[in-house]
Amino acid sequence: MPWYLWTPFVFAALLIAVPPIVRGLIRYRLDDYRVQVNEVDARLPRQLETKRRVAVLGGGVAGLTAAITLARRGFEVELFESNSYLGGKLGSWKVQLAPGEDAWVSHGFHAFFANYFNLDRFLNSLGLRTGFQSIGEYVILGTDGAQVRFGKLDTTPVFNLIALARAGVYRFRDVLKAPARDLFGVFLEYDAKDTFERYDNVSFADFDRLAQLPPRLKLAFNTFARAFFSDEDKLSLAELIKSFHFYYLSQDGGLVYDFPTHDYEPAFLAPMRAELAKHHARVHLSTAVTSLAKTESGFIVNGAVFDRVVLSTDIVGARSIMTKAEGVPDEVKAHFDALTPGQRYAVLRIWIDKDVREGFPPFVITDRVKVLDAFTTYHRFEAEAQEWTKRHGGAVLELHCYAVPEDLSPEQVKQALLDEFVQFFPEAKGFTVAHEVFQLNRNFTAFHLGMNAKRPETDSGVPGLVCAGDWVKLPFPAMLLEAACASGYVAANTLLRDERLQEEPVDSVPLRGLMAGMPQPPARKVLAPKGRA
């Protein structure tokens, strides 16, 4: 009998009979859930002795990580940011609600998961991993009012899958018979090379259709998929496999995460600006990069001469800068020209005169009707929002759509967010909006079909120019904020290595899944456009 037929039953028997032993074997197989991906030679010096000027293009998490790391090591750093604030997707800026009444707003709520190893280390190096609160529960709210809760589930890989069944997300008979039995194994088999070769040209919608997902499991998959700014028919199955490996099947931190209880500006960005100033780095806000040229000895950025460049803008900025850059080979430009952003995403912050019922964590994912993917109740945890509700009553909410349908106008998106919110919270019907801030952007990294092969790596192909951002192909699995921070460290390490300096340690979840390398079931061929299995 092939392994994929008997393995589920053997695993189930072992899990029931000797769970401590099985947990230990899983931890061993998954490298104790954490690996260091680079070697740090402690014999090498840490500080730069010769003058090196570095231009960091983009002040998001990736650029800030690289800039602060290099500035601390003695590089002369200049950071260029087109916005009037630092932070990128973690950025924050003030808006006026009324005369004498301002508020900080941002691109939206961010989660800080237990396996964000590099981001944690970066924040800890600044003394900023304080003032966080646990979300307590990870909730998906269905249109029928039913809730799928993940917070109390077992966190050990494989045990957490069984826990989903016990929580009613699926029934064992749904996944132990074909076709699901033969297809679900892909999520335990992550391997960067094989996974992307086999499944990068397969959409999650194709997988859903072939696997015949039960309704609640489909809901969990769909909401998770849209968090990567893509509808199911556009999202690469390989990228989804990587994200499931990263968040759920490679470590025992679970899906319960932390979040800061203060706005990102005082919590993160002001201290980061102070750290840059402490190490004599120059920051140019509201300064777009209008020209980049490679020269024999280095680079010219906006007319100024530099020895090295870190390209750390968002995906739209990176494509614009590199396709117009002088002295850059055409084959390098082609990689950047292939970059495209994901679908539009919308964030609507509203200050309203009615509150909503309690009993939910501050951030809740929703079963989308047409646009509403999640909402945040800021007045339940953020000091500034709490002060506003003390003065005015009501609530401060944020409504999210991660993948906006292409056929909707901005006004239609905004109205649909409000309408769908009331469907979930009818007690808010008839509310009045005192203030609102609506954002509709298209600048997030796309994880669409077939994009991985041409995705730029840290080494841009131009000597002295390195890339950082969540759009960069890394040699280890990472997603979202962790991918941005880790890529900043990898970019900085490349320049440190060039100068024979000690690198910064970079950690990752295990590089391969629990069942990676196992033979593929013949039925798996239905997922492979080229017949690979």
Spans of features found by a protein language model:
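Helical element adjacent to the flavin cofactor pocket in flavoenzyme catalytic cores
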Residues: 243-299, 306-308, 312
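Mid-domain catalytic core of redox enzymes
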Residues: 12-23, 27-34, 287-397, 402-408, ...
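FAD-binding beta-loop-beta segment adjacent to the flavin cofactor pocket
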Residues: 385-391, 441-475
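Mobile amphipathic helical/loop "lid" adjacent to a hydrophobic cofactor/ligand pocket
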Residues: 119-120, 124-125, 129-241, 504
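Extreme N-terminal leader/targeting segments of oxidoreductases
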Residues: 2-54, 72-73, 511, 515-533
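N-terminal Rossmann-like FAD-binding beta1-loop-alpha1 element of flavoenzymes
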Residues: 49-79
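Conserved FAD-binding subdomain of flavin-dependent enzymes
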Residues: 98-134
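Glycine-rich FAD pyrophosphate-binding loop
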Residues: 71-96
